[in-house]
Amino acid sequence: MRFIIFNGTLKPDAESNTSKVVQMLKLAFEKLGQECKVVTLRDLNYERATKDVKDELAPHIIDIFNCDGVIFATPIWWGGHGSYIQTMFERLDPIYSWSKDNKYQPFYNKVFGTLVSGGGDGFQ
């Protein structure tokens, strides 16, 4: 099986609890013989939009069509998910809307999950 993890951490990897847990999950998948790709959204140059845009994020969105599972990893910020994951959800909106109109369901038969980390600041 092929998995893709979208890492929505806002911090550099060395300081990020989210990145540490993402790497643990990636290693666990690989130990089970599964392919796993990690995309750290913070490292990409992409537009925040609810439309189809050709930028550094676009090829990774296409990868969703060719994998078996997608995981969105985010820290908790002020009781909610991080801004990078929010942008990712917004970028998926045109695909969902297009599929409703065309009876093509690229998200069907895929496993979607979330990985949420918190407490890095000792408060949440």
Regions found by a protein language model. Give the residues of each.
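Short, glycine-/small-residue-rich phosphate/pyrophosphate-handling segment
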Residues: 103-124
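N-terminal beta1-alpha1-beta2 submodule of the flavodoxin-like/Rossmannoid cofactor-binding fold
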Residues: 1-102
